[in-house]
Amino acid sequence: MIILIYLFLLLWEDTQGWGFKDGIFHNSIWLERAAGVYHREARSGKYKLTYAEAKAVCEFEGGHLATYKQLEAARKIGFHVCAAGWMAKGRVGYPIVKPGPNCGFGKTGIIDYGIRLNRSERWDAYCYNPHAKECGGVFTDPKQIFKSPGFPNEYEDNQICYWHIRLKYGQRIHLSFLDFDLEDDPGCLADYVEIYDSYDDVHGFVGRYCGDELPDDIISTGNVMTLKFLSDASVTAGGFQIKYVAMDPVSKSSQGKNTSTTSTGNKNFLAGRFSHL
């Protein structure tokens, strides 16, 4: 009996921050910043920064590379990122709250690669700046409109913003583009918005968008969605406004009709991950 109680307490501790509260599944992967610590990657993609470059990125934003203790303090309040990055003194690692088979080797804590002798290795960065102003955010309201930084004025160069939408379990997300004007190029390699039908920007890729044509509406397959906005160091444009509305689960009486209603009315849409209502 004592052993069973002990095992229960261990499991309870492990699940804190990863369960349901007020009908919303809380998963700390959504936290882009905690205790002044935040994750940065190069604008060219993941694992592109040398130690000197990572240090310069943090200092450019008014901060510095996070120490191991600062990263661990952030992890203890829910900071979870599945990407190795430079820390102070040439250390590399990443914070894991929830163990998983594809991230963290099934462990929790700081996955520590130690102090690297080769400072030319390329990783991401973990910066510390408790006073930095970040674009993006986490939304749990049933409907919301969010905008590019400075909208309706043009956005600035060198922006990286994340918006995470997490609704009540069972709901889905109807995403609509109200205004959209980004630098246009054939491969959307300069300025773009990426949409993911998941809780992070690793899984569930839906599409990358640029130019000035309004993308079609998108409906998620679940109650979470992630949007990433990136601008490069040159041309800017008018920016965007994006609206989302929660879609309640289809009632049993309407099953089989392949219909659903939101306050946005009937419009063409792309279902997240190409599923259908």
Curated annotation (Swiss-Prot):
Residues 36-129 form the Link domain. Disulfide bonds join C58-C127, C82-C103, C135-C161, C188-C210. Residues 135-247 form the CUB domain. The keyword Manganese does not apply. It comes from the Eukaryota. Changing E183S: Reduces the binding affinity to calcium ions. Abolishes the interaction with heavy chain ITIH1. Keywords: Calcium, Cell adhesion, Disulfide bond, Glycoprotein, Hydrolase, Metal-binding, Secreted, Signal. It is found in: Secreted. CDD domains: CUB (cd00041), Link_domain_TSG_6_like (cd03515). N-glycosylated. Induction: Up-regulated in peripheral blood mononuclear cells, high endothelial venules, airway epithelium and submucosal gland in response to inflammatory cytokine TNF. Down-regulated upon differentiation of mesenchymal stem cells to osteoblasts. InterPro entries: C-type_lectin-like/link_sf, CTDL_fold, CUB_dom, Link_dom, Sperma_CUB_dom_sf, Spermadhesin-Link_domain. Changing Y47F: Abolishes binding to bikunin. Impairs binding to hyaluronan. Retains the ability to bind heavy chains but cannot transfer them onto hyaluronan. Impairs binding of hyaluronan to CD44. Decreases hyaluronan-dependent lymphocyte rolling. Its EC number is 3.1.1.-. Expressed in airway epithelium and submucosal gland (at protein level). Colocalizes with bikunin at the ciliary border. Present in bronchoalveolar lavage fluid (at protein level). Expressed in mesenchymal stem cells. Found in the synovial fluid of patients with rheumatoid arthritis. Interacts (via Link domain) with inter-alpha-inhibitor (I-alpha-I) component bikunin. Interacts with ITIH2/HC2; this interaction is required for transesterification of the HC to hyaluronan. Interacts (via Link and CUB domains) with ITIH1. Chondroitin sulfate may be required for the stability of the complex. Interacts (via Link domain) with various C-X-C and C-C chemokines including PF4, CXCL8, CXCL11, CXCL12, CCL2, CCL7, CCL19, CCL21, and CCL27; this interaction interferes with chemokine binding to glycosaminoglycans. This is Tumor necrosis factor-inducible gene 6 protein. The gene is TNFAIP6.
